[in-house]
Amino acid sequence: MNTDKLALIKQSIKTIPDYPKPGIMFRDVTSLMEDPAAYQATIALFVERYKDLGVTKVVGTEARGFLFGAPLALELGVGFVPVRKPGKLPRETISESYELEYGHDMLEIHTDAIKPGDKVLVVDDLLATGGTIEATVKLIRQLGGEVEHAAFVISLPELGGEHRLAEMGLSLMTLCEFEGE
Protein backbone atom coordinates (compact mmCIF):
# COMPACT_ATOMS: atom_id res chain seq x y z
CA MET A 1 0.00 0.00 0.00
CA ASN A 2 1.02 3.58 -0.54
CA THR A 3 2.88 4.60 2.63
CA ASP A 4 2.42 8.32 1.96
CA LYS A 5 -1.36 7.90 1.79
CA LEU A 6 -1.38 5.75 4.92
CA ALA A 7 0.65 8.35 6.83
CA LEU A 8 -1.69 11.13 5.68
CA ILE A 9 -4.73 9.14 6.81
CA LYS A 10 -3.32 8.27 10.24
CA GLN A 11 -2.14 11.84 10.87
CA SER A 12 -5.60 13.19 10.06
CA ILE A 13 -7.34 11.08 12.72
CA LYS A 14 -7.63 13.03 15.96
CA THR A 15 -7.45 11.27 19.31
CA ILE A 16 -9.75 12.57 22.03
CA PRO A 17 -8.71 11.41 25.51
CA ASP A 18 -11.33 10.44 28.09
CA TYR A 19 -14.21 10.43 25.59
CA PRO A 20 -16.94 9.26 25.93
CA LYS A 21 -15.77 8.27 29.42
CA PRO A 22 -12.56 8.42 31.46
CA GLY A 23 -9.82 6.09 30.27
CA ILE A 24 -11.05 5.87 26.66
CA MET A 25 -8.90 7.20 23.82
CA PHE A 26 -11.51 8.02 21.15
CA ARG A 27 -10.30 7.87 17.53
CA ASP A 28 -12.28 10.50 15.61
CA VAL A 29 -12.59 9.68 11.90
CA THR A 30 -14.69 12.78 11.31
CA SER A 31 -11.42 14.74 11.38
CA LEU A 32 -10.20 12.55 8.49
CA MET A 33 -13.25 13.54 6.43
CA GLU A 34 -12.54 17.23 7.07
CA ASP A 35 -9.33 16.76 5.06
CA PRO A 36 -10.30 16.08 1.42
CA ALA A 37 -6.88 14.63 0.56
CA ALA A 38 -7.05 12.16 3.46
CA TYR A 39 -10.66 11.22 2.69
CA GLN A 40 -9.84 10.68 -1.00
CA ALA A 41 -6.76 8.64 -0.07
CA THR A 42 -8.89 6.41 2.16
CA ILE A 43 -11.40 5.63 -0.58
CA ALA A 44 -8.62 5.24 -3.19
CA LEU A 45 -6.80 2.62 -1.09
CA PHE A 46 -10.01 0.66 -0.58
CA VAL A 47 -10.82 0.84 -4.31
CA GLU A 48 -7.31 -0.34 -5.20
CA ARG A 49 -7.73 -3.39 -2.93
CA TYR A 50 -11.27 -4.41 -3.94
CA LYS A 51 -11.74 -3.30 -7.57
CA ASP A 52 -10.92 -6.69 -9.10
CA LEU A 53 -12.54 -9.03 -6.56
CA GLY A 54 -16.01 -9.20 -8.09
CA VAL A 55 -17.79 -7.35 -5.28
CA THR A 56 -21.48 -6.83 -6.13
CA LYS A 57 -22.58 -4.98 -2.97
CA VAL A 58 -20.94 -2.88 -0.28
CA VAL A 59 -22.56 -2.99 3.16
CA GLY A 60 -21.87 -0.21 5.66
CA THR A 61 -22.75 -0.34 9.34
CA GLU A 62 -24.48 2.50 11.14
CA ALA A 63 -23.43 5.19 11.13
CA ARG A 64 -19.81 5.88 10.24
CA GLY A 65 -19.63 2.83 7.98
CA PHE A 66 -21.96 4.74 5.66
CA LEU A 67 -19.36 7.51 5.30
CA PHE A 68 -16.79 5.14 3.81
CA GLY A 69 -18.99 2.42 2.34
CA ALA A 70 -21.20 4.63 0.14
CA PRO A 71 -18.36 6.44 -1.69
CA LEU A 72 -16.51 3.14 -2.07
CA ALA A 73 -19.61 1.51 -3.61
CA LEU A 74 -19.91 4.40 -6.09
CA GLU A 75 -16.25 4.06 -7.09
CA LEU A 76 -16.66 0.29 -7.52
CA GLY A 77 -19.89 0.77 -9.50
CA VAL A 78 -21.95 -1.42 -7.16
CA GLY A 79 -24.90 -0.95 -4.81
CA PHE A 80 -24.59 0.26 -1.23
CA VAL A 81 -26.64 -1.35 1.56
CA PRO A 82 -26.97 0.26 5.01
CA VAL A 83 -27.20 -1.89 8.14
CA ARG A 84 -29.00 0.10 10.82
CA LYS A 85 -30.24 0.12 14.38
CA PRO A 86 -33.79 -1.19 14.90
CA GLY A 87 -36.70 0.82 13.53
CA LYS A 88 -34.68 2.94 11.08
CA LEU A 89 -35.36 0.99 7.86
CA PRO A 90 -38.82 1.31 6.25
CA ARG A 91 -39.20 -2.01 4.41
CA GLU A 92 -39.26 -5.57 5.73
CA THR A 93 -36.13 -6.36 7.72
CA ILE A 94 -34.36 -9.14 9.55
CA SER A 95 -32.38 -8.46 12.70
CA GLU A 96 -29.42 -9.80 14.62
CA SER A 97 -28.50 -8.98 18.20
CA TYR A 98 -24.94 -8.74 19.48
CA GLU A 99 -23.19 -8.23 22.79
CA LEU A 100 -21.78 -4.95 24.00
CA GLU A 101 -19.45 -4.41 26.92
CA TYR A 102 -22.49 -3.74 29.14
CA GLY A 103 -25.58 -5.25 27.54
CA HIS A 104 -26.58 -5.88 23.95
CA ASP A 105 -27.72 -4.12 20.80
CA MET A 106 -29.35 -5.07 17.53
CA LEU A 107 -28.87 -4.39 13.82
CA GLU A 108 -31.28 -4.69 10.90
CA ILE A 109 -31.06 -5.04 7.12
CA HIS A 110 -33.76 -4.93 4.44
CA THR A 111 -34.68 -8.49 3.41
CA ASP A 112 -34.52 -7.57 -0.29
CA ALA A 113 -31.19 -5.70 -0.14
CA ILE A 114 -28.95 -8.76 -0.57
CA LYS A 115 -29.63 -11.44 -3.15
CA PRO A 116 -28.36 -15.03 -2.94
CA GLY A 117 -24.89 -15.12 -4.45
CA ASP A 118 -24.13 -11.42 -3.96
CA LYS A 119 -20.43 -10.96 -3.19
CA VAL A 120 -20.49 -8.51 -0.31
CA LEU A 121 -17.78 -6.28 1.11
CA VAL A 122 -18.48 -5.00 4.65
CA VAL A 123 -17.10 -1.56 5.55
CA ASP A 124 -16.91 0.29 8.86
CA ASP A 125 -14.79 3.06 10.29
CA LEU A 126 -13.33 1.14 13.22
CA LEU A 127 -12.74 -2.46 14.25
CA ALA A 128 -12.71 -2.98 18.01
CA THR A 129 -14.21 -6.22 19.41
CA GLY A 130 -15.79 -7.23 16.10
CA GLY A 131 -19.30 -7.68 17.52
CA THR A 132 -20.98 -5.24 15.15
CA ILE A 133 -19.36 -6.76 12.08
CA GLU A 134 -20.04 -10.32 13.25
CA ALA A 135 -23.76 -9.46 13.51
CA THR A 136 -23.64 -7.74 10.10
CA VAL A 137 -22.02 -10.76 8.45
CA LYS A 138 -24.65 -13.06 9.99
CA LEU A 139 -27.41 -10.89 8.50
CA ILE A 140 -25.83 -10.93 5.05
CA ARG A 141 -25.25 -14.69 5.11
CA GLN A 142 -28.81 -15.28 6.31
CA LEU A 143 -29.99 -13.56 3.11
CA GLY A 144 -27.69 -15.72 0.96
CA GLY A 145 -24.90 -13.21 0.44
CA GLU A 146 -21.28 -14.28 0.34
CA VAL A 147 -18.98 -12.31 2.63
CA GLU A 148 -15.24 -12.88 2.48
CA HIS A 149 -13.89 -9.36 3.00
CA ALA A 150 -14.23 -6.51 5.49
CA ALA A 151 -12.49 -3.12 5.37
CA PHE A 152 -11.81 -0.65 8.17
CA VAL A 153 -10.11 2.70 8.45
CA ILE A 154 -8.95 1.98 12.02
CA SER A 155 -8.24 -1.18 13.99
CA LEU A 156 -7.72 -1.47 17.74
CA PRO A 157 -5.95 -4.88 17.74
CA GLU A 158 -5.80 -5.30 21.52
CA LEU A 159 -9.62 -5.61 21.60
CA GLY A 160 -9.59 -8.86 19.60
CA GLY A 161 -11.81 -8.00 16.65
CA GLU A 162 -9.30 -9.13 14.02
CA HIS A 163 -9.09 -12.61 15.52
CA ARG A 164 -12.86 -12.84 15.96
CA LEU A 165 -13.54 -11.97 12.32
CA ALA A 166 -10.75 -14.21 11.01
CA GLU A 167 -12.53 -17.09 12.77
CA MET A 168 -15.57 -16.23 10.61
CA GLY A 169 -13.44 -16.65 7.48
CA LEU A 170 -13.06 -12.95 6.70
CA SER A 171 -10.05 -11.38 5.05
CA LEU A 172 -9.53 -7.95 6.63
CA MET A 173 -8.05 -4.68 5.43
CA THR A 174 -7.28 -1.96 7.95
CA LEU A 175 -5.53 1.27 7.07
CA CYS A 176 -4.40 2.35 10.57
CA GLU A 177 -3.76 0.57 13.83
CA PHE A 178 -3.86 2.32 17.17
CA GLU A 179 -2.58 0.52 20.26
CA GLY A 180 -3.77 2.12 23.49
CA GLU A 181 -1.81 5.25 22.51
From Swiss-Prot:
Kindly state which keywords UniProt assigns to this record, in alphabetical order: Cytoplasm, Glycosyltransferase, Purine salvage, Transferase
Major location, coarse class?
A: cytoplasm
Heme found in the keyword field: no
Q: Which Pfam families match?
A: Pribosyltran
Its EC top class is transferase
Keyword Transferase recorded: yes
Which family does the record claim for this protein? Belongs to the purine/pyrimidine phosphoribosyltransferase family.
Q: Which PANTHER family match?
A: ADENINE PHOSPHORIBOSYLTRANSFERASE, PHOSPHORIBOSYLTRANSFERASE DOMAIN-CONTAINING PROTEIN
> What is the recorded name of this protein?
Adenine phosphoribosyltransferase
